[in-house]
């Protein structure tokens, strides 16, 4: 019998704390699969803010940094400038990114910062 699906290496074995039916677990798996497929686990840094994404450091095997509410793009900018060889991504919910964090997101885009922003609604 062949294995059809296995857990991505970029995900830990920690049980998810999200509510039943929430898509965060699926999105975590997709992010981890991308990290595995690109072979960037050892040089990836995730930035998570408050809200549901706050525990991302428990679920990804890459380095993770906590950011204040809405400030993940600003923190990601600082991390990327300090470590330009690393892949830096933010993992943010709608209240964090599209409400209090709108300015940081827009300005990071306007400056063409080399970060990836994952917007979870």
Language model regions located:
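Active-site diphosphate/adenylate-binding microenvironment
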Residues: 3, 8-68
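Thiamine diphosphate
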Residues: 52-121
């Amino acid at each position: 019998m062949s294995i059809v699906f296995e857990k991505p290496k970029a995900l830990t074995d920690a049980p998810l704390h999200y509510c039943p039916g929430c898509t965060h677990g699926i999105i975590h798996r997709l992010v981890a699969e991308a990290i595995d497929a690109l072979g960037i686990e050892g040089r990836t840094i995730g930035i998570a803010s408050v809200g549901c994404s706050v525990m991302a450091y428990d679920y990804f095997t890459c380095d993770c940094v906590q950011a204040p509410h809405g400030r993940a793009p600003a923190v990601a900018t600082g991390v990327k400038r300090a470590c330009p060889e690393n892949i830096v991504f933010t993992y943010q919910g709608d209240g964090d990114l599209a409400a209090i964090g709108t300015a940081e997101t827009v300005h990071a885009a306007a400056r063409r910062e080399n970060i990836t922003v994952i917007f979870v609604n």
